[in-house]
């Protein structure tokens, strides 16, 4: 039996395709024939018909056909399926033989060629005698044939050739050798495929006809054989549905066979073959659930058919192969588009195959454990005459014997012994590892991390059994991280134990030390006596001695390992092993904790390192080092205790570096921070604990940061969630879970002992020089020096505020854009204890809104810390939010000379510009001066002098000015005419004289200016008196370039009598004036309506009386009639 006997035959696993042989092609020396052959077999696409082609010589001897039985009455079959039958029909017996022959229809020597072709066909038929194989002829021609019916000669000669060769017309083909050769070949293939299907259909009918002669008493094996053949021929015919149906029938028939120890292997072998075919076809038909159901049924039926107890490993091997084959089928189906899921993927089948392979290994170990004196049987009972078995699943020493009684027990024993001795030479671990590797790949693909880790552990253990310790260690080390992170401590302990054995057998010092450290720790579930043994071995290694062998190791491997350890001892030297503990769980726990999250630079930095041992016995360490991100401090945090190597495990509890199991040891450190580290974070980068002597072998346990290992985070989480009350400890003892790691602290500046006061009058007014008085007083006990002031806008605010805020120390001049928003490091001298100073800062805010201002005072002072004098830079800052507001609101109005509101003004007609300045400041404002700057399009009617100089405005008070202006010409109606600017110079009433006034420029609004065709103004006294004549003179001026026809009328009033023209029509020349004189005679006192003047311009109908009344008065105050006072009246009064 060879180790590969359990592999399925290649012909069973391949896809059956119709077998067609091509004869008459010289593919070596004839280029045309080579091109034809390449077109048949090279680069075949999936859409071409499934045919297997083979080039054979014309006189090739095909397998002889055995004589057909006419009766099965006395026939007793020797087995189910011959080992060569599938290969015979796949590769030896063709469904069709194609004879290629070069012959054109116009061949001059037609008769000779025809005869030669017929001879070749006859030779092929002779070699196929007794077979139903079809024969076809293909004529290779140089010319492209004419369409059917057009070439009479071709038709005649084709019929003659078919007659001579005894062929039907469907078996003669023409192949022109042209540029379209591949197209012709594909058409030929399709025709060949039809012939092949006919052949396989005939074979199926032939096999079915044999079944009529069978009986179930003596021909049970033939029922299975014939059903398998029918299914196989159906596959060759590509009728997969019928093939599946017949395979299912064959499978059921197999399990109907009487099973005995002598034929159980044959039954299982055939059941395995047929099951493979059924599952393959189910996957091919895209019915994976049917395939899975069939496989489960197959396993349930066969798993208890073990056979001979002495060959139990064979059953395990067979079971392993079943699962592996199904896994391969499943994986192949997935590659072709099938979708698998986490709970149903090929990995489970590979895993089960590995399980049975392991079972095979165990059985082989138990059954094949013969003495070395036992010799292999001679002659070899496993050898056959032909070198192969006649029937699948039979024993070589009793082929074709179907009797359940063993005729030769001695030969049977020899055969079993030969199989057992062969099995002993099988490397089972390689088989198991290959299957586990396949399973791991599948579980990784389908994201099943725990299954993957579980199988990787098994792989590692299998490598250990195979004595490949390097690979075992690599795999086990890889999966340990997962088990640590998920706290599978029992599993982790088992893996660590195997890893420790590997590292011992390879004499890997660092790995041996690392795994020993972890097996001694709290994550290990080993008993104390086992831990004590490991601890003792660890100390032996540190003392440069060989450790004791690990239990249950291979004897030969232990001897090799002891030599390796001896070599390690002879190479004694300074061996320091740095082991980072963040990725595993050592037997010592470490936590570092600063006393506070921050320390002032004039206070010593203090922190504690807490250590706790989990090993069985007290242990003494030699040195503790704490490292920081600033390495200057490392020298201050070293604790070293001299001890001999032999004292490491002595029961000594004295000394700071001796750790008692379960007790927390606190080690305190302090140092003075550097002044340049103010504002920086000091971090503990690592804590190193030395075990052993640095002069010999030494282990350095290195914790990153403030401590903690692979299990710390999970333990802290469990402790936080736990409601269990902590046990009371003695006063000098510390509960480990109550210690929280604090691995960093901040160095902050010394607490300043000065006071900073700000004096100001908020809110600030926009654009004024706002005064901030900063008072600094020292309360230090010693002089301070290098006092510096930083004042201005606090950084980090809106960029627009930065651009519109300017700070200066000189208030006598206004700030411009060149001044900064923040004045930094202004030297203000030194201060003695109790002394104070003042500094005035001026701020100009160009926009309204809130601003945060910063005042920062820094100074230097000498102080003593832990006997060392240091120079401390102290600082104190204060911030204040100041609101900036508008100092006043300015309202501008355009009115007529009658103080009526104007929407627009008229060219050359005077109007009034009125300004109202309303104080919005909570403080009194002094208006230093005001100025009206007119645009070129405006002129003043009189001198523009300020009317509000030196006016002081309280909150809510207003000051008004009035200016008489004239617009010489009309402007753009849409945009209006620019008026100019109104400039107000002002400052707070409370500021000193040296502070400059602020000039606020208000841009006056544009006004629409229009031309008027006729301007009318009136000259009349300011008042009248009852019954006294009141002369009124109206002036009419033509403002156009046209002669104006004017109709004038006066409407009387009840309060007046008048004399003058009541109605007149006149003409006014361009640019000239016309006067109209009236005498009004008032009749009543008080404000009285004047007689209304109405003007109608014939050329300008839009000129209305309503517009006219804007220019002339419509009423006047009339005083009552006066009388002379007599002296008596006066006296009486």
Swiss-Prot record:
Component of the multisubunit TRAPP (transport protein particle) complex, which includes at least TRAPPC2, TRAPPC2L, TRAPPC3, TRAPPC3L, TRAPPC4, TRAPPC5, TRAPPC8, TRAPPC9, TRAPPC10, TRAPPC11 and TRAPPC12. The gene is Trappc11. Involved in endoplasmic reticulum to Golgi apparatus trafficking at a very early stage. It comes from the Eukaryota. GO terms for cellular component: cytoplasm; TRAPPIII protein complex. InterPro entries: TPC11, TRAPPC11_C. GO terms for biological process: constitutive secretory pathway; COPII vesicle coating; endoplasmic reticulum to Golgi vesicle-mediated transport; Golgi organization; regulation of protein complex stability; vesicle tethering. This is Trafficking protein particle complex subunit 11. The modification N6-acetyllysine is found at residue 245. It holds the Pfam family Foie-gras_1. Belongs to the TRAPPC11 family. It is found in: Golgi apparatus; Golgi apparatus, cis-Golgi network. Keywords: Acetylation, ER-Golgi transport, Golgi apparatus, Transport.
């Amino acid at each position: 039996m060879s180790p590969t006997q359990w592999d399925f035959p290649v012909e069973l696993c391949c896809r059956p395709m119709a077998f067609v042989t091509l004869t008459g092609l010289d593919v070596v020396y004839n280029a045309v024939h080579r091109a034809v052959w390449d077109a048949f077999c090279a680069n075949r696409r999936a859409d071409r018909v499934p045919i297997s082609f083979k080039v054979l010589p014309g006189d090739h001897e095909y397998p002889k056909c055995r004589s057909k039985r006419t009766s099965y009455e006395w026939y007793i079959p020797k087995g189910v399926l011959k080992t060569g039958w599938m290969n015979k029909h796949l590769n030896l017996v063709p469904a069709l033989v194609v004879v290629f022959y070069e012959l054109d229809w116009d061949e001059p020597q037609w008769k000779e060629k025809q005869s030669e072709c017929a001879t070749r066909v006859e030779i092929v038929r002779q070699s196929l005698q007794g077979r139903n194989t079809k024969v076809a002829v293909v004529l290779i021609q140089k010319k492209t044939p004419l369409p059917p019916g057009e070439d009479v000669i071709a038709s005649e000669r084709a019929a003659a050739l078919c007659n001579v060769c005894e062929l039907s017309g469907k078996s003669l083909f023409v192949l022109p050798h042209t540029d379209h050769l591949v197209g012709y070949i594909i058409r030929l293939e399709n025709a060949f495929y039809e012939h092949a299907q006919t052949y396989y259909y005939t074979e199926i009918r032939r096999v079915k006809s044999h079944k009529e002669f069978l009986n179930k008493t003596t021909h049970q094996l033939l029922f299975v054989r014939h059903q398998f053949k029918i299914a196989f021929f159906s596959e060759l015919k590509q009728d997969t549905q019928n093939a599946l149906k017949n395979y299912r029938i064959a499978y059921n028939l197999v399990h109907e066979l009487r099973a005995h120890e002598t034929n159980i292997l044959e039954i299982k072998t055939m059941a395995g073959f047929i099951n493979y075919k059924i599952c393959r076809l189910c996957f091919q038909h895209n019915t994976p659930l049917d395939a899975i159901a069939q496989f489960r049924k197959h396993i349930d039926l066969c798993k208890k058919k073990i056979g001979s107890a002495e060959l139990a490993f064979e059953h395990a091997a067979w079971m392993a192969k079943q699962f592996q084959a199904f896994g391969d089928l499943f994986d192949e189906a997935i590659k072709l588009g099938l979708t698998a899921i986490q709970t149903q993927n090929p990995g489970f089948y590979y895993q089960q195959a590995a399980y049975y392979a392991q079972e095979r290994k165990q059985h082989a170990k138990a059954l094949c454990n013969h003495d070395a004196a036992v010799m292999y049987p001679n002659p070899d009972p496993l050898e056959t005459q032909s070198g192969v078995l006649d029937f699948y699943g039979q024993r070589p020493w009793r082929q074709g014997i179907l009797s359940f009684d063993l005729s030769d027990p001695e030969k049977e024993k020899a055969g079993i012994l030969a199989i057992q001795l062969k099995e002993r030479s099988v490397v089972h671990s390689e088989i198991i590892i290959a299957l586990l590797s396949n399973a791991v790949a599948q579980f990784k693909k389908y994201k099943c991390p725990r299954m993957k880790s579980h199988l990787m552990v098994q792989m590692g253990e299998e490598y250990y059994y195979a004595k490949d310790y390097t690979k075992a260690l690599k795999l086990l080390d890889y999966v340990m991280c997962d088990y640590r992170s998920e706290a599978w401590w029992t599993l982790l302990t088992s893996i660590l134990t195997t890893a420790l054995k590997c590292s011992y057998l390879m004499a890997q010092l660092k790995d041996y030390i690392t795994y020993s450290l972890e097996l001694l720790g709290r994550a290990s579930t080993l008993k104390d006596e086992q831990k004590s043994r490991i601890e003792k071995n660890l100390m032996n290694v540190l003392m440069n001695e060989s450790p004791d062998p690990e239990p249950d190791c291979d004897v030969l491997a232990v001897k090799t390992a002891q030599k390796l350890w001896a070599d390690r001892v002879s190479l004694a030297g300074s061996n320091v092993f740095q082991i980072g503990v963040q990725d595993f769980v050592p037997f010592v726990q470490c936590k570092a904790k600063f006393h506070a999250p921050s320390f002032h630079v004039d206070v010593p930095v203090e922190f504690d390192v807490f250590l706790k041992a989990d090993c069985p016995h007290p242990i003494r360490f030699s040195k503790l080092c704490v490292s920081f991100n600033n390495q200057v401090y490392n020298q201050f945090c070293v604790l070293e205790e001299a001890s001999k190597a032999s004292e490491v495990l002595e029961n000594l509890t004295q000394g700071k570096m001796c750790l008692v199991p379960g007790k927390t040891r606190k080690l305190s450190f302090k140092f003075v921070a550097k002044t340049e580290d103010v504002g920086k974070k000091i971090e503990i980068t690592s804590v190193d604990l030395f075990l052993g002597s640095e002069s010999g072998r030494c282990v350095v346990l290195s914790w990153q940061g403030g401590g903690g290992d692979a299990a710390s985070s999970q333990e802290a989480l469990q402790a936080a969630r736990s409601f269990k009350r902590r046990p009371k400890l003695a006063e000098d003892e510390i509960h480990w879970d109550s210690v929280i790691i604090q691995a960093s602290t901040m160095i902050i500046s010394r607490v300043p002992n000065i006071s900073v006061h700000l004096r100001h009058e908020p809110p600030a007014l926009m654009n004024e020089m706002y005064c901030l008085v900063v008072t600094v007083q020292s309360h230090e006990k010693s002089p301070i020096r290098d006092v510096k002031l930083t004042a201005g806008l606090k950084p980090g605010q809106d960029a627009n505020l930065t651009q519109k805020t300017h700070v200066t120390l000189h208030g006598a001049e206004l700030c411009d854009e060149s001044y900064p928003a923040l004045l930094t490091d202004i030297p203000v001298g030194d201060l003695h204890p109790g002394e104070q100073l003042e500094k005035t800062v001026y701020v100009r805010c160009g926009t309204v809104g809130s601003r945060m201002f910063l005042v920062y005072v820094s100074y230097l002072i000498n102080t003593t810390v832990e006997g060392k004098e240091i120079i401390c830079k102290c600082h104190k800052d204060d911030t204040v939010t100041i609101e900036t507001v508008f100092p006043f609101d300015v309202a501008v109005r355009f009115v007529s000379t009658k103080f009526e509101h104007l929407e627009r003004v008229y060219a050359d007609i005077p109007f009034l510009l009125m300004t109202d300045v309303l104080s919005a400041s909570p403080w009194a404002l002094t208006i230093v001066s005001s100025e009206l700057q007119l645009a070129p399009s405006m002129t003043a009617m009189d001198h523009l002098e300020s009317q509000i100089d030196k006016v002081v405005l309280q909150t809510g008070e207003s000051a008004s000015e009035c200016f008489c202006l004239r617009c010489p010409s009309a402007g753009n109606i849409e945009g209006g005419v620019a008026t100019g600017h109104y400039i107000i110079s002002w400052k707070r009433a409370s500021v000193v004289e040296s502070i400059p006034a602020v000039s606020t420029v208000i841009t006056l609004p544009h006004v629409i200016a229009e031309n008027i065709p006729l301007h009318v103004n009136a000259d009349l006294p300011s008042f009248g008196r009852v019954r006294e004549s009141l002369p009124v003179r109206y002036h009419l001026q033509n403002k156009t370039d046209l002669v104006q026809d004017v109709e004038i009328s006066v409407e009387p009033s009840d309060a007046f009598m008048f004399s003058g023209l009541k109605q007149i029509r006149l003409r006014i020349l361009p640019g000239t004036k016309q006067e109209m004189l009236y005498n009004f005679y008032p009749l009543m006192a008080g404000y009285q309506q004047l007689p209304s003047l109405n003007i109608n311009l014939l050329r300008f109908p839009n000129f209305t009386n309503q517009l006219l009344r804007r220019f002339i008065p419509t009423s006047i105050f009339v005083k009552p009639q006066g009388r002379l006072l007599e002296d008596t009246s006066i006296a009486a009064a």
